């Protein structure tokens, strides 16, 4: 017979999960749904950066806080910081100039024109993966050096703005005259999970330059900002690096002149660090132990800092005055003959074989070195087109200074959107084409004007579907990443947007609205287009038995064609727009994932996505006037029919062909085809999260709520680019 003691021992040996204290029951622990279903639709991307993660609360206004900042005092403190060398991370030549320029560059340099994501606008360098990228080694120290300044000024200056301003001050302190600085970057409080950094699983995997043109990636290797400084795949060949350089800088919207200026300007100051082999360097900040307090890459070589520092593994100092602006980069590039050598860490670099020792040692004034350069620096001499520009800058330092000032400004402000978002005393007056400039408003419609225009639009013979389609086509180009696109400017009427196939269904309505604008002669076409959507929604709601006034904020203006860079606006052409049941060039990305991507660009939540798709299907707003997803026999009525019929078990769905892109919904009893749908429709019944929202709107008590929610989400999209009223 067993005793209580025996029973206790048996339970202990079996490790009863209820009382042993070693079960991983912490929040978020254990196997997740994504472990079981790795291709699960990422609806959670639409919940990023909510107020629940913002410690500053709903009432915080960054623009107001910045207006109370002593800007001159801040810049003075940054200038003092540059030469306040800290023993835990000693400054090269007693100055953090190069370090802060690199921090600013790498903060901004993740931007990609293709999808507008990345860039400096959110202060993402604080978070993974960027805080631990191989190309960002030691920038954790730069951010810690900045902390006393950030701590002093608190929320009057965001981290995102501070990173860039610190780089500007570093340049100015070196004797360079910058083009200006615009603040207005608001911090977020968690990593951007929507950015596709690539599919590679290992750091520094090589990408062919041609592949970069087919994906919104900004670097030739996973974990780099731009290109491998040792040449493609560590080739050591300067000439072969030219395609990669053009591809990566081109993905940011930089031309050859801007590219040369940025490379040379960025390498006029500071140095790289490669005192010893990389095996001395510890884990990155995200992998570091808790006592490291967010710092990574601890080095076991010597002191691990100062003269013993290891970052890229390259040991290069470009110029004789690494803390003072000069034209020595180009002078050295063309004056000397360069031979391939290796750094103490074993990285491929070049040394000026016929040069005297003219480069000062960063910590021992009695020592000098020969000039050294990166493999990719020499590309500026050995690529024919880059060489022409480089020689011009060699012979005309002022042209170089002007080109770098403008290119640096573009680099660091590229993802900020229109100049209306810029704040601060150093914003340049000049409008630049990459800012998508708009003319000043010359007339503000009165309420009487608005009422008159609404009546004229309503009597113009346009259907609800046409009114909705033209307004959506105008507003839905907005991208939350770089704040480009949107209805303001009425660029729907300009090249290239007027010629996009996705906008073909808006052509008749656009022509009608242009005629109304010519007769009105006061209101902008941009306002009239949005007002057309207002009329359409109000008509559709009334037809559904709900009287509602759709909010409308006048004040938009009309851009000119010469204010519109056609090539840059081509990036705004949607690859897919599930709200209109549009999908362009086929890819391996599922249609429903592209729908989530589009909603994320429009800063929509999952409920907003759901109500908008359901409403637009009821209003017949498909780009090609197809019946896909139009689960109603009363098109143009703002009804919940889409949800009711999608969730109705009378229908079963089958793909029409092997692509499984289009489906037929058949009556289970008769076999009759009742509806057709795309993946962008059926996902609201198949995905468990989206279905939960669809069930709300399919309920019998949801009709009025649906109309109100649709109006709110619709108005949000129409005003996404109205930074003047936000």
UniProtKB/Swiss-Prot annotation:
Functional description taken from the UniProt entry: Bifunctional enzyme with both catalase and broad-spectrum peroxidase activity.
Amino-acid positions noted as binding heme b in the UniProt annotation, renumbered to this chain: 267
Record PANTHER family: CATALASE-PEROXIDASE, HYDROPEROXIDASE I, BIFUNCTIONAL CATALASE-PEROXIDASE
Residue positions of the active site: 106 (proton acceptor)
PTM section of the record: Formation of the three residue Trp-Tyr-Met cross-link is important for the catalase, but not the peroxidase activity of the enzyme.
Cofactor remark: Binds 1 heme b (iron(II)-protoporphyrin IX) group per dimer.
Family: Belongs to the peroxidase family. Peroxidase/catalase subfamily.
Classification via InterPro entries: Catalase_peroxidase, Haem_peroxidase, Haem_peroxidase_sf, Peroxidases_AS, Peroxidases_heam-ligand_BS
Source species of the chain: Cronobacter sakazakii (strain ATCC BAA-894) (Enterobacter sakazakii)
Cross-link Tryptophyl-tyrosyl-methioninium (Tyr-Met) (with W-105) residue location(s): 226-252
Gene3D superfamilies registered for this protein in UniProt: 1.10.520.10, Peroxidase, domain 2 (1.10.420.10)
Annotated keywords: Heme, Hydrogen peroxide, Iron, Metal-binding, Oxidoreductase, Peroxidase
Cross-link Tryptophyl-tyrosyl-methioninium (Trp-Tyr) (with M-252) placement: 105-226
Region spans: Disordered: 1-34
Alphabetical list of PROSITE patterns matching this protein: PEROXIDASE_1, PEROXIDASE_2, PEROXIDASE_4
Protein's GO biological process: cellular response to hydrogen peroxide; hydrogen peroxide catabolic process
Pfam families referenced in this protein's UniProt entry, alphabetically: peroxidase (PF00141)
Protein name: Catalase-peroxidase
Catalytic reactions on record: H2O2 + AH2 = A + 2 H2O; 2 H2O2 = O2 + 2 H2O
UniProt gene name: katG
GO cellular component: cytosol
GO MF terms held by the record: catalase activity; heme binding; metal ion binding
Bias type Polar residues, positions: 1-12
């Amino acid at each position: 017979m067993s005793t209580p003691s025996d029973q206790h021992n048996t339970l202990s040996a079996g490790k009863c999960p209820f009382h042993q204290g070693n079960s991983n029951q912490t929040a978020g622990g254990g196997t997740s749904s994504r472990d079981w279903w790795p291709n699960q639709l990422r609806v959670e991307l639409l919940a990023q950066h909510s107020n629940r993660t913002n410690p500053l609360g709903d009432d915080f206004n960054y623009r107001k806080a910045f207006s109370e900042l002593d800007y001159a005092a801040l810049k003075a403190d940054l200038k003092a910081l540059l030469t306040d060398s800290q023993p835990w991370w000693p400054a090269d030549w007693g100055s953090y100039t190069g370090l802060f320029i690199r921090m600013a560059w790498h903060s901004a340099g993740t931007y990609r024109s293709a999808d507008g994501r990345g860039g400096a606008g959110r202060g993402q360098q604080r978070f993974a993966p960027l805080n631990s990228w191989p190309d960002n080694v030691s920038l954790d120290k730069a951010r810690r050096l900045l902390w006393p300044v950030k701590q002093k000024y608190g929320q009057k200056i965001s981290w995102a703005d501070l990173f860039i301003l610190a780089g500007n001050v570093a340049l100015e302190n070196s004797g360079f005259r910058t083009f200006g600085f615009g603040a207005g970057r608001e911090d977020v409080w968690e990593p951007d999970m929507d950015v596709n950094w690539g599919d590679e699983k290992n750091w520094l995997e090589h990408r062919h330059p041609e592949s970069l043109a087919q994906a919104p990636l900004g670097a030739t290797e996973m974990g780099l900002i731009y290109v491998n400084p040792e040449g493609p795949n560590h080739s050591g060949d300067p000439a072969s690096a030219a395609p990669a350089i053009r591809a990566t800088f081109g993905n940011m919207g930089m031309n050859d002149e801007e590219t040369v200026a940025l490379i040379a300007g960025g390498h006029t100051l500071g140095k790289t660090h490669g005192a010893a082999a990389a095996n001395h360097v510890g884990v990155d900040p995200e992998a570091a132990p808790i006592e490291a307090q967010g710092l990574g890459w601890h080095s076991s070589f010597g002191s691990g800092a100062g003269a013993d520092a290891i970052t890229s593994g390259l040991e290069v100092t470009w110029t004789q005055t690494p803390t003072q602006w000069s034209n020595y980069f180009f002078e050295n590039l063309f004056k000397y003959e360069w031979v391939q050598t290796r750094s103490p860490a074993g990285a491929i670099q070049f040394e000026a074989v016929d040069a005297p020792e003219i480069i000062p040692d960063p910590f021992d004034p009695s020592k000098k070195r020969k000039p050294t350069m990166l493999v990719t620096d020499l590309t500026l001499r050995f690529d024919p087109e880059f060489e022409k520009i480089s020689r011009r800058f060699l012979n005309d330092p002022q042209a170089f200074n002007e080109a770098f000032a403008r290119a640096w400004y573009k680099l660091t402000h590229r993802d900020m959107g229109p100049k209306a978002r810029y704040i601060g005393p150093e914003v340049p007056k000049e409008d630049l084409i990459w800012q998508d400039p708009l003319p000043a408003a010359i007339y503000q419609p009165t309420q009487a004007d608005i009422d008159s225009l609404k009546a004229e639009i309503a009597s113009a013979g346009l259907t609800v579907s046409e009114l909705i389609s033209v307004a959506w086509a105008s507003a839905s180009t907005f991208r939350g990443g770089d704040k480009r696109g949107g209805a303001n400017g009425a660029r729907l009427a300009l090249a290239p947007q007027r010629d996009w196939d996705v906008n073909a269904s808006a052509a008749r309505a656009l022509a009608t609205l242009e005629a109304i604008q010519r007769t009105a002669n006061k209101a902008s076409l941009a306002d009239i287009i949005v007002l057309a959507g207002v009329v359409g929604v109000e008509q559709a709601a009334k037809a559904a038995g709900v009287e509602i006034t759709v909010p409308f904020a006048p004040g938009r203006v009309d851009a000119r064609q010469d204010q519109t860079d056609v090539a840059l606006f081509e990036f705004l052409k949607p690859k897919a727009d599930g709200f209109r049941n549009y999908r362009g060039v086929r890819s391996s990305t599922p249609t429903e994932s592209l729908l989530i991507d589009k909603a994320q660009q429009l800063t929509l939540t999952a409920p907003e996505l759901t109500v908008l798709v359901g409403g637009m299907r009821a209003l017949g707003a498909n780009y090609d006037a197809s019946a896909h997803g139009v689960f109603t026999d009363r098109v143009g009525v703002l009804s919940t029919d889409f949800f009711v019929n999608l969730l109705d078990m009378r229908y079963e769905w089958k793909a029409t062909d092997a692509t499984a892109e289009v489906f037929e919904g058949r009556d289970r009893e008769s076999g009759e085809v009742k509806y057709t749908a795309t993946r962008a429709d059926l996902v609201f019944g198949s995905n468990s999260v989206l279905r939960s929202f669809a069930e709300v709107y399919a309920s019998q008590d949801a009709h009025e709520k649906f109309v109100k929610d649709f109006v709110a989400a619709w108005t949000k999209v129409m005003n996404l680019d109205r930074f003047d009223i936000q």
